[in-house]
Curated annotation (Swiss-Prot):
It is found in: Cell membrane. GO terms for cellular component: plasma membrane. It is a peripheral membrane protein. Belongs to the ATPase alpha/beta chains family. Keywords: ATP synthesis, Cell membrane, Hydrogen ion transport, Ion transport, Membrane, Transport. InterPro entries: ATPase_F1/V1/A1_a/bsu_nucl-bd, P-loop_NTPase, V-ATPase_su_B/beta. One of its GO terms (molecular function) is ATP binding. Has multiple subunits with at least A(3), B(3), C, D, E, F, H, I and proteolipid K(x). This is A-type ATP synthase subunit B. It comes from Methanothermococcus thermolithotrophicus. One of its GO terms (biological process) is proton transmembrane transport. It holds the Pfam family ATP-synt_ab.
Amino acid sequence: NTNETKVRFTGETAKIGVSLEMLGRIFNGAGKPIDGGPEIIPEKKLDINGYPLNPVSRNPPNAFVQTGISTIDGTNTLVRGQKLPIFSGSGLPHNTLAAQIARQAKVRGEGEQFAVVFAAMGITNEEANYFMEEFKKPGALENAVVFINLANDPAIERIITPRLALTTAEYLAYEKDMHVLVVLTDMTNYCEALREIAAARNEVPGRRGYPGYMYTDLATLYERAGRVKGRKGTVTQIPILTMPHDDITHPIP
């Protein structure tokens, strides 16, 4: 009932409570547990938008992440702290690929801790059930944190989901010295949510109705990958998107 709905501004940005207890858990797109487990007792609360990172403080990527996919490991090697996008088409098995990478990725080296943060945005119930079953396989969820946003969830939640995932990854990487691989799928659904929210706010549309700040917004996500001087952990990203109508010239790709 919108007539009786009240909104109170707190003067603060959205935050997520983070803890090592998040490993092995599955959350919805708003960060609430959906695996039947208890609520997370947070060690601290972090701004989901992250914090400014001085480019000078970045270290160049130079170490290998093994995905277990021969075409990636052999010809498009994924390096810790790198962003490696996967462009897919409608009907292609990108969900299978995403689940396989999340399940079997690892880093080599003695004493190296590794974790996967998986964020699915705007997926169907069938796809969500597929991912849930994949992560329930033995050993798949042990070092993973999973966020699942469904297609029938609010669009604003779809905007929050990748930020929750990246904030969790930064916590594990920079405060717990872990090498974290973040898999984001499907970024096309994220951009569609951006367009929907921009239209609801009566903003001036850009190409094909997408907001003019879409690329800036995407940069706030992609630039959170990297290696930071003085920190052992790293954040590596694999964003996956389906090209609308298989068109590489579409604004999203």
